[in-house]
Design a protein with these regions (language model features):
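Surface-exposed binding/hinge segments that line
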Residues: 49, 84-131
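Sec-exported extracytoplasmic/periplasmic mature domains
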Residues: 20, 24, 55, 72-79, ...
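Ligand-site clamp/hinge motif
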Residues: 166-210
Length: 211
């Protein structure tokens, strides 16, 4: 679920969401799985009021306990070495308190001005289905399960990753039914795939292979 490279992040951001996010083409912080939030006067406590009626892709409920489970595992002393952003985002977090089913408070050890901005980086703070974490021994690499507009279908290593539209998504439905992320390492081969109609979009192409 946690990504530290650009290509994986492009996939993860379709599957997972965080409490807050960046507005399109902007650095403004806007609601996502949290509808609103309050910050204490001393900047040490962030209380998030969560969106109700949201389901994970496996049909389980998104709630405050799910947030706590996800964030607790990234706190200092709990984070594993594959959690590249844990120290950056959660290093100053003291604890996470479930106030009620849809309210959660994050307490900090010291005020951190960019805390919300850091939390908006979904690649480092995705909300994963607690059931999926439990069922897969905390490794959902092969079975990612979030609340996002697309659901994971398959990952064929070195070939492609296939996602399908989440028909039960709480927000605006995705416009495309399926998305296939093809893994084509060679720059020239990516350009050929685009020109042949085998790909709709490509990226990471060097200028010297484009006419």
């Amino acid at each position: 679920a946690l990504a530290d490279d650009g290509e994986s992040t492009k996939i993860n951001t379709n599957i997972y969401e965080g409490l807050v996010k960046y507005a399109d083409d902007s650095t403004e912080i806007v609601p996502c799985l949290a509808e609103s939030w309050d910050v204490s006067d001393d900047g040490l406590s962030y209380t998030f009021h969560l969106r109700q009626g949201v389901k994970f892709h496996d049909g389980t409920d998104f709630n405050a306990e799910a947030v706590k489970i996800n964030y607790d595992r990234q706190l200092p002393g709990n984070a594993t070495e594959n959690m590249s952003y844990a120290g950056f985002i959660f290093g100053s977090v003291k604890d996470i308190v479930v106030d009620d089913d849809y309210t959660v408070t994050i307490n900090l050890t010291e005020a951190q001005t960019p805390f919300l901005a850091n939390l908006a980086m979904v690649q480092g703070s995705p909300i994963v289905s607690p059931k999926a974490l439990e069922d897969n021994n905390n490794d959902v690499t092969q079975a990612p399960c979030g609340t996002g507009p697309y659901k994971f279908v398959r990952w064929d290593v070195e070939q492609d990753v296939i996602l399908e539209r989440n028909e039960d998504y709480w927000g605006e439905p995705a416009k495309t039914k399926n998305v296939i992320f093809k893994i084509i390492k060679d720059n020239s081969a990516r350009v050929i795939a685009l020109n042949n109609g085998e790909a709709d979009i490509i990226d990471g192409v060097d200028s010297n292979v484009v006419d």
